[in-house]
């Protein structure tokens, strides 16, 4: 395993991987082409200073925010550095670099970790460039109702992807999934994780962290935050759960505006979507009024505008008048939840967000949000792409070196790559070799036969018998060569399959499938610190790191 000083990130253009939307590729590599859709160049120092000035003026109530965050982080393991960061948020000059993710099982795919690392890396950079105190915040998104999306984690075992699924038997619409209390079944999933991870010096500590976080009776959002907190315990990362009555109360003005005029909030989103399509890009969002959900006892339901004064919970017969909905917002704001459009606006209404660290999909979402930020009277933060990373183990690097491959060569799948490598590595074309040799043998025997018959006419039959025997032996030799070639091809296929499974498991980028615990168990929890030193904050390229 490379030492921290030996580890370095090799950069690959995002387009070479064939895994990212064109909009994201241009955002990273040709910002001027998409500048019309965003508040500023994420790498520009003047843009950062302007974003910081706007962000510092924004929070709805810094005191309530800080008090709430202190209470929340106490549940997950509040250390002094995190406490200090939360107290810093009371300072009217302070700003935040924010990221967030759904509460995936065991932290979900690697990209959750890369989002966090990028956020932590940017704190000092933004402080130096803006002269302001900067706080790292992780938004714990537990209000989604798509349980299947967050209920599985994947690790590698013997170069195969092993899925670990938690199936507590919830309804199709369980409400805010983060609120779900873990059942006894979580212990079986943790045990399966234990079985899947190979023995190592680091395994006891890794599994202790997992078992401490994922206990029966614990809310899914709390388990997620506790494990993330233990992985980044020395970094002062502030976790924030928006599913809190105090934070929802602060967000009433934003939600009220959406209820009072829901078409006004969706119009700029859809207009930006049309503009993106006109430029040849994909529109990520097709918004419908409203941008809110109702968190009922029986699930999480989209609130649809039915006519000028009536709203219906999507998929049900339950309706509200506008005044009824506004009264409920005043009385129980915690019953309301933002959709994908209002979620970042709620975040930036509550926090002094100067920069948001986003994945490729989120970067595409934000391209449609400029107008809705204007509608809400908010300044959109700068959008900083998270680090996109492939971790290359030594066994995989050997395969890449042997066949002269890069991570980008795996973009089209295993079979096309296998065919390319076989053509390059096979030294003998068996069919061509024998197709050339057999006519030459026949020609030699044809020339020999009359000479032999001149000595003894009865030897002509012997010549033909010899011809037949030689042809049989040549066929046997050909089959031996074919079998030897197949063994070589099978070896090539096995080696490429190993590399493909590690780099593009199930055909997707490693960072979108594999869980970080596989690597921490094998290479030490210190790998996270190593990555912070190896990865660059210029995330315009995919970064390949040897482990």
UniProtKB/Swiss-Prot annotation:
It comes from Salinibacter ruber (strain DSM 13855 / M31). The gene is bshC. Disulfide bonds: none annotated. One of its GO terms (molecular function) is ligase activity. Its EC number is 6.-.-.-. NCBIfam families: thiol_BshC. Keywords: Coiled coil, Ligase. This is Putative cysteine ligase BshC. It comes from the Bacteria.
